[in-house]
């Protein structure tokens, strides 16, 4: 697989050539841009939407700057050929489509950092190949008739779902799965089983998810049965975001996420426990986004303080200047003065330019983030990022889009992380930073031996 790096100019592929790897209309050296292989071989039911799906991925390649080849020839699955691609899309494949040698080559490709995208019947594929089952996340079990349903968008930062409404209504053939992937994959969206008939997953029905799997990246969406799906702008944006993440052009936290409770869920009701300290404010947008204005002030969670916890939240800078300033404060006492948080707590910074200990991912003024890891994990201005801030005892750790970038221990006797409040900073008139979905899970006061041994 080619080296992951910054996106450069690329072109989309030419017309679909069945039975062989299609060559792009304009050929390029492998180091120029990204390349994606669409694989649509079927050994069982064949979806008549496959040609529309191939054409759609080609169009997404034009929009996203990656070259698209398409094939139904399993002979493309050799180690040498797969190294040409940053991602492989299984487009409504069915049945046993690869032989043992081809499976081994694909496993090696994933283990060396390759990307996988599964669309719809990719979950109805290779039931006797355990590696593939883990990669896809879940196997197909059954489906009711095509009908409209409501999709609950659970992750509003991942590029596959960040542009979707929280409640997304669309028509498709809705799969039931043999198992629930939630424990080992990161669920991006799920079906509201009360909104349609035929759901059999007892009210917890994931329909799109992502995961880091055996060295590679895997994204799956259950949509895409109908040809009309590939003309829907929202579904195409969903698919493009999934491909971009799988091939490494966008970053996201795809670790499993369970047991969190919302502190802010995008509704005005969830702001009841928060108070504004100091000048400025936050505006709640129609899509459930909080955006800072003026300052310097602090929107802090006044309902209660916290000791040991994992705090997750999604954030982005405006994209206009690329240098907006904000931060997430932890471990401070209750106060109507925003400077109390500065002087008594700790800030995990959001700021593109300053000295290292005062830029994004830093514990502001105390410890820089790992700059190399931070820069690789960071999405650019205008795109969403996810922080996890984990506090246990006097230890504070920071993950950016699933990558640990800071590990700080408080030694200042005048400050303590063992109990304190949380807050979001509105820094000034020229700084516009947006937040979504602030959620928290309480933890034991000390990391478990197993967690510590894993380097978490």
Q: Language-model segments: which ranges?
A:
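Extracellular ligand-binding/catalytic regions of CAZymes and related secreted enzymes
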Residues: 30-34, 40, 59-66, 72, ...
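Active-site rim elements
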Residues: 44, 146-148, 195-196, 225-233, ...
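Helical hinge/lid and interdomain linker segments adjacent to catalytic or ligand-binding clefts
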Residues: 35-41, 45-124
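Catalytic beta-strand/loop cores that center a nucleophilic Ser/Cys/Thr
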Residues: 138, 142-215
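Carbohydrate-interacting regions of secretory-pathway proteins
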Residues: 125, 138-142, 254-456
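Solvent-exposed loop/turn segments at secondary-structure junctions
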Residues: 42-45, 74-76, 93-97, 116, ...
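Secretory targeting and sorting signals
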Residues: 2-27
């Amino acid at each position: 697989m080619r080296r992951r790096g910054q996106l450069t100019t690329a072109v989309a592929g030419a017309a679909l050539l069945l039975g062989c790897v299609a060559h792009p209309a304009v050929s390029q050296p492998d180091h120029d841009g990204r390349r994606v292989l669409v694989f649509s071989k079927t050994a069982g039911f064949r979806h008549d939407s496959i040609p529309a799906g191939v054409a759609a991925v080609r169009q997404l390649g034009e929009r996203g700057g990656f070259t698209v080849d398409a094939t139904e020839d399993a002979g493309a699955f050799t180690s040498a050929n797969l190294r040409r691609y940053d991602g492989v899309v299984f487009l409504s494949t069915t049945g046993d489509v690869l032989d043992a040698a081809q499976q081994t080559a694909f496993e090696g490709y994933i283990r060396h950092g390759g990307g996988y995208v599964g669309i719809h019947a990719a979950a109805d594929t290779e039931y006797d190949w355990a590696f593939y089952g883990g990669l896809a996340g879940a196997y197909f079990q059954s489906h009711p008739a095509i009908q409209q349903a409501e999709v609950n968008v659970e992750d509003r930062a991942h590029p596959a779902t960040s542009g979707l409404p929280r409640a997304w209504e669309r028509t498709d053939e809705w799969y039931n799965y043999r198992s629930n992937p939630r424990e080992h994959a990161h669920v991006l969206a799920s079906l509201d089983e009360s909104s349609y008939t035929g759901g059999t997953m007892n009210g917890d029905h994931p329909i799109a998810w992502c995961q880091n799997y055996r060295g590679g990246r895997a994204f799956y969406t259950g949509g895409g049965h109908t040809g009309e799906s590939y003309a829907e702008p929202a579904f195409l944006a969903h698919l493009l975001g999934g491909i971009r993440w799988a091939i490494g052009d966008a970053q996201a936290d795809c670790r499993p996420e369970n047991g969190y409770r919302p502190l802010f869920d995008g509704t005005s009701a969830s702001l009841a426990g928060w108070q504004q300290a100091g000048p400025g404010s936050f505006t709640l947008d129609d899509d459930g986004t909080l955006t800072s204005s003026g300052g310097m002030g602090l929107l802090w969670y006044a309902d209660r303080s916290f000791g040991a916890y994992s705090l997750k939240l999604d954030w982005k800078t405006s994209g206009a200047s690329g240098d907006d300033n904000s931060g997430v404060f932890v471990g401070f006492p209750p106060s109507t003065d925003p400077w109390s948080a500065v002087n008594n707590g700790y800030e995990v910074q959001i700021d593109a330019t300053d000295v290292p200990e005062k830029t994004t991912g830093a514990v502001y003024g105390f410890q820089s983030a790992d700059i190399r890891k931070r820069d690789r994990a960071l999405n650019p201005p205008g795109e969403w990022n996810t922080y996890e801030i984990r506090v246990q005892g006097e230890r504070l750790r920071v993950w950016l889009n699933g990558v640990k970038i800071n590990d700080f221990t408080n030694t200042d006797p005048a400050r303590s992380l063992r109990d304190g409040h949380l807050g979001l900073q509105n820094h000034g008139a020229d700084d516009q930073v947006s937040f979504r979905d602030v959620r928290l899970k309480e933890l034991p006061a000390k990391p478990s031996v197993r967690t510590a041994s894993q380097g978490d």
